[in-house]
């Protein structure tokens, strides 16, 4: 019989909130008897925006802004029914996007 995996992918703009949510998921999975692989840090996506500082002239004077999207990957190997139930009830911080694949 093939073992079942749960793959969890987390995204957030703030890496501290992302790491805290990752720790909560890992602790919950280990507490219910599942094996956890990860967290694996994935490459951060950096979006840069350049705008003119002045609304009228001075095209050479510009300002740059950036948004960094940090990502983590977790694999839960052979989850028990208690693991799935505990993960469904888990309340993560606001600002963390969670994608789950079975």
From Swiss-Prot:
Swiss-Prot/TrEMBL keywords: Ribonucleoprotein, Ribosomal protein
| Listed GO MF terms | structural constituent of ribosome; tRNA binding
Keyword Amino-acid biosynthesis present in the record's keywords: the answer is no
GO biological process terms held by the UniProt record: translation
Please report a single Pfam family linked to this protein.
Ribosomal_S10
Any single GO CC term annotated in Swiss-Prot or TrEMBL for this entry: ribonucleoprotein complex
Q: Subunit arrangement?
A: Part of the 30S ribosomal subunit.
Q: Which PANTHER family match?
A: 30S RIBOSOMAL PROTEIN S10 FAMILY MEMBER
Family according to the record: Belongs to the universal ribosomal protein uS10 family.
Chain's role: Involved in the binding of tRNA to the ribosomes.
Q: What is this protein called?
A: Small ribosomal subunit protein uS10
Q: Which organism is it from?
A: Paramagnetospirillum magneticum (strain ATCC 700264 / AMB-1)
């Amino acid at each position: 019989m093939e073992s079942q995996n749960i793959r969890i992918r987390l995204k957030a703009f703030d890496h501290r909130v992302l790491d805290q949510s990752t720790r909560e998921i890992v602790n919950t999975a280990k507490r219910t008897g599942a094996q956890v692989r990860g967290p694996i840090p994935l490459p951060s996506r950096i979006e840069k925006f350049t705008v003119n500082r002045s609304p009228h002239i001075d095209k050479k004077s510009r300002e740059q802004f950036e948004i960094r999207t940090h990502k983590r990957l977790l694999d839960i190997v052979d989850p028990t029914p208690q693991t799935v139930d505990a993960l469904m009830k888990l309340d993560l911080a606001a600002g963390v996007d969670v994608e789950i694949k079975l």
